[in-house]
Amino acid sequence: MKADNRNRTSVAIVGAGPNGAALANLLGLYGVDTVVVERAPQIVDFPRAVGIDDEALRLFQTAGVADELSRDIIQNVPLRMFNARGECFADVRPSVREFGWWRRNIFMQHLAERTLRDALARYPHVSLRTGEEVVGLEQDDAHVTLRVQGADGQHYALDADYVVAADGGRSPLREMLGIPLAGTTHPMKWVVVDVKNAGLDQPCTALNCDPRRPNVCIYLPFNYRRWEFLVFPHEDEQAIAQPESIRALIAPYVEDVERLEIVRARTYTHHSRVAERFVAGRIALVGDAAHLSPPWIGQGLNAGLRDVGNLAWKLAGIVHGRLNPGVLATYESERRAHAKAMIDLADTFGAMLMPTSRPVAFLRDRLLAAARFAPGLKDYVLQMRFKPMPSYTRGVVVTGASDASGAIGRMIVQPDVETADGVRRKLDDVLGPWFSIIGWQCDPQASLSDDERAFWTALGAKFVQIVRSRSGTCREQRIASAHGSECVEDVDNAMADWFDRHAGPLVVVRPDRYVAAQTDAVGIAGVTAAFRAFAPQQQAEAAHVC
């Protein structure tokens, strides 16, 4: 940046890890003046997150960085669970791509951070300041002032309309705000090791559920591999991270342990904690600053990216005067409960998969072996249907009698569609990065009054009509909108299936791809009226008199 004013910005993000950098990319896309303050002068090289799911990649698709990130990602990696005898008792390999991406993918955090930071160069209104530390803050009803120690050691004040704490599990900003991080710190520690040249042809994430020493082995990009070993209470956490100890731990799993190169090793403690508040005045917490999870279902970083996806458009809408400031509070009401649910699931999985008790491990093996003969239960596990999906009943949603289908407050699917010029595209690329209104086999503008159309246009919504594949009279004459909506074809019948399950041909889709409302031509007036509550008063009134 680019930004000429060093001391003033619309949004300040503290922390340039994957959550902070992802948020900065989205705010850059939305045209929001943004400053990112990062204490570390360089991207840190510790072993960190390696799992990224379909929801996260969908967010990066919106941000315009999914393709570049994918160059460093192994997609569609199965999860296999092995007992103490080395027998695989569960093979989790989801085959569905309902959101347009595979559910299980493996990456390395430091590579993703570099890509995300490099992508910020696209935006002259976004500034990344590394080697700078926030040492104090003050806020009032109008703005937040951060006291920042610059890379040169000098202090300066940074005024922002809003601040986001993406500064990790030890979050200094959360501490400054006095927000408790409630929950549990687990007594057991784990040594995490990244190696090269392991010579192991095991292209999966392996949970070695051996009660003698539970461990995880993860297939990483570019000939890397990660092991995570339980450290018992009587063991010294520094000694076990030494090269000779690491090789002794890995030796049972490789042919030539001397051949592998130990790249990095660190001992970690697992936490299951959630901040009591995600929003304090004009400051929001995201990622590890808001919640800490054990790694057993690979959702720690992904939960943080859900925070980012939920928060980015709300901040952008508020800053640009399209949404009222009260919408910020819905970030907490929508995200906190789901973040807690994911942590609870991770705790359950950890207790089931990594017991150190042999009788408990024996019982687990028998139960999971039996589950293979129950088709419904088997599919529930192998397709990862156990992962709780966010479902918003309050916040920026319009529920009520129209929600008989259960779609409102849930993420909409993302199939491929075909544009008027015959190009196959992912649905989100057609919807655009902001609000959209989909009409299934109807023009979404046809049932809007001039007043209602003016409101949605002022909000910035895009109108998209989806029709059945090959609905036109011939290849050269496809169905077109009479009102200027973009018209696309449902080439794989995925949207037809979705609308069969969720009645109502008109769907309001939020920028984070959650369904804000679903209705019909009669109900769209009520939905529009309800949505006016989310707009600034002057905008709602102006649209009402157009």
Curated annotation (Swiss-Prot):
Key words of the record: Aromatic hydrocarbons catabolism, FAD, Flavoprotein, NAD, Oxidoreductase
Cofactor: FAD
Annotated residues for binding of FAD: 10-39, 278-288
Sample GO molecular function, one term: 3-(3-hydroxyphenyl)propionate hydroxylase activity
Catalyzed reactions per annotation: 3-(3-hydroxyphenyl)propanoate + NADH + O2 + H(+) = 3-(2,3-dihydroxyphenyl)propanoate + NAD(+) + H2O; (2E)-3-(3-hydroxyphenyl)prop-2-enoate + NADH + O2 + H(+) = (2E)-3-(2,3-dihydroxyphenyl)prop-2-enoate + NAD(+) + H2O
GO BP terms: 3-(3-hydroxy)phenylpropionate catabolic process; 3-phenylpropionate catabolic process
Record function comment: Catalyzes the insertion of one atom of molecular oxygen into position 2 of the phenyl ring of 3-(3-hydroxyphenyl)propionate (3-HPP) and hydroxycinnamic acid (3HCI).
InterPro entries: 3-HPP/3HCI_hydroxylase, FAD-bd, FAD/NAD-bd_sf, PheA/TfdB_FAD_monoxygenase
HAMAP family linked to this entry: MhpA
Coiled-coil regions listed: none
Organism: Burkholderia vietnamiensis (strain G4 / LMG 22486)
Matching Gene3D superfamilies: 3.30.70.2450, FAD/NAD(P)-binding domain
Transmembrane segments: none
UniProt family annotation: Belongs to the PheA/TfdB FAD monooxygenase family.
Protein name per Swiss-Prot or TrEMBL: 3-(3-hydroxy-phenyl)propionate/3-hydroxycinnamic acid hydroxylase 2
Gene designation per UniProt: mhpA2
Metabolic or biological pathway: Aromatic compound metabolism; 3-phenylpropanoate degradation
Annotated NCBIfam families: PRK06183.1-3 (NF004829), PRK06183.1-5 (NF004831)
Signal peptide as annotated in the record: none
